[in-house]
A protein has these predicted regions:
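FAD-site-proximal beta/loop scaffold in flavoenzymes
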Residues: 1-45, 139-148, 153
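Mid-to-C-terminal Rossmann-like scaffold of FAD/NAD(P)H-dependent oxidoreductases
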Residues: 19-125, 178-188
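C-terminal auxiliary extensions adjacent to catalytic cores
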Residues: 94-165
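Generic "edge-of-domain/loop-turn" microfeature
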Residues: 7, 13, 80, 122-123, ...
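An exposure/low-complexity boundary signal
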Residues: 152-189
Length: 189
């Protein structure tokens, strides 16, 4: 059991990774998170404390990625398996390939809450910025090309995803053109 500085109840004894349980986890985070990203972030935080710069553990928005055989899986923000109001989901699945996305959003405010992707790699920094700035699901969907992190020459699915999104929401949103300025500077308009 650790506090926000990863300190146990014993002087100068710390715990990180899945060996630690947060006494007061951040909103939307679990008290134990057994993924390597959180272990790495805890290690970076503890290194600051051990070198004289006491720092609280602040993991930010939930994210994770994994690979199931040849299928990439990524999640950013919170996407409930069974959403409860006011959370709603937009879902798109490719008819022939192992590619799908689920966008979670607040049905009242349209605030983007999170995304799960299968077969599509996403750009962490941009998605985190969209979440931190509490952008709408509409802003997120128009930024799909910039958020995509698949290697060059991979298939892209943004146009097909946007087509279904516009049909489902009765909107006429256009994709923002991929911009290295947006990608490198994390500028979301």
């Amino acid at each position: 059991l650790v506090n926000k500085y990863l300190e146990t109840n014993q002087n100068s004894i710390y715990a990180i990774g899945d060996c630690s349980e947060q006494q007061e986890p951040q909103t939307g985070r679990r008290s134990i998170e057994a993924v390597w990203y959180t272990g790495r972030m805890m290690g970076e935080t503890l290194a600051q404390t051990l070198t004289g710069n006491k720092k609280a553990y602040n993991p930010g928005h939930w994210f994770n990625s994994a690979k199931f055989f040849d299928i990439e899986y990524q999640t950013y923000g919170l996407v409930a398996a069974q959403p409860t109001k006011p959370e709603k989901h937009f879902h798109w699945k490719h008819p022939n390939e192992n590619v799908a996305i689920t966008l979670a959003y607040d049905e009242n405010t349209k605030k983007f809450l999170g995304i799960n992707t299968f077969g599509i790699r996403m750009r962490h920094e941009l998605l985190d910025k969209i979440l931190c700035e509490k952008k709408s699901v509409f802003c997120m969907i128009e930024q799909l090309a910039n958020c995509n992190f698949d290697p060059e020459f991979f298939k892209t699915y943004e146009k097909k995803i946007l087509l279904k999104f516009n049909q489902d929401f009765n909107t006429n949103i256009k994709l923002k053109k991929k911009s290295w300025k947006v990608i490198f500077n994390n500028i979301i308009s």
